[in-house]
């Protein structure tokens, strides 16, 4: 497995990222992760292919229990219209993710990859030292092609929201 150094850090401490980078124009790897639908006590499985034909935004975060990740997740609620499926992805337990989304009255789904590092490796966002995901944003069109990919190096910084919104509004996604 590819390991990348010098591409992620927090407060000057370098982190190793596992997996190769994905780029616009590439097919997005399918995934299977858990979500906890509101009002249900048992997690269910979600895959990227479940929403084929729709534009998807993957908001990949370290943990929903950190201020930067919370701010970022709230921001996507404000910026992205209902015609785009937003998934917040982390290695948090599905119960923690759903609790936070419920408190915030968020409309989008949270996906948990806590059982496996497969998503992190496939999307090139697994932080080896933390066993968490690197902050990143992916916009995937209805055909499953990546139209925007941003890997945020400084884990204390938010992504470039406008670049992702521009990719969504470019009209070439449907």
List each language-model region with its residue ranges:
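Chalcogenol-based redox active-site neighborhoods
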Residues: 1-174
